[in-house]
Amino acid sequence: MRILYAASEARPFAASGGLADVAGSLPKALCAAGQEACVVMPYYVNSLKPEQKEKMNYITNFTVPVGWRSQYCGLFSQQVDGVTYFFIDNEFYFKRDNGLYGYFDDAERYVFFSRAVLEMLKYIQFKPQVINSNDWQCALIPVYYDLFYRNAGGCYDNIKHVFTIHNIGYQGQYG
């Protein structure tokens, strides 16, 4: 089975809690069990160690529809312990100095991320059978899939979705 594990944080690249531990270990365990698993997360450039930045592989860039405009998205990758990590880059959203979360525009940041995860599938060789979306930051991935990609064909054919909540206390409620 080919599984894309979408998370807002993953060890060894960025961590604020237990989600990063799971996102860093579960895909590795799935690969060890004979499955194909990759991780996709934001490219928090200020959270990376210099040696992690040096090992980043640029794949491409594209635009992501966000409301009434299109936003730049860079796509990078890196292999760690047999797992491919994909990184969604946009410095406006993810180059922050004071941690991963708690910004006035968190809702918009993860709207962008959720849509970018689906857009990136056009540009990578990995074609998931399942996307496992984790916590509120990735909650729109299955929604956007149903709205915009389900009938698009090609790399979007027959993708199943799993939504995992790691801490029900963090719901990403805005308004």
Regions found by a protein language model. Name each.
Residues 1-175:
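Catalytic cores of nucleotide-sugar-dependent glycosyltransferases that transfer UDP/GDP/TDP-activated
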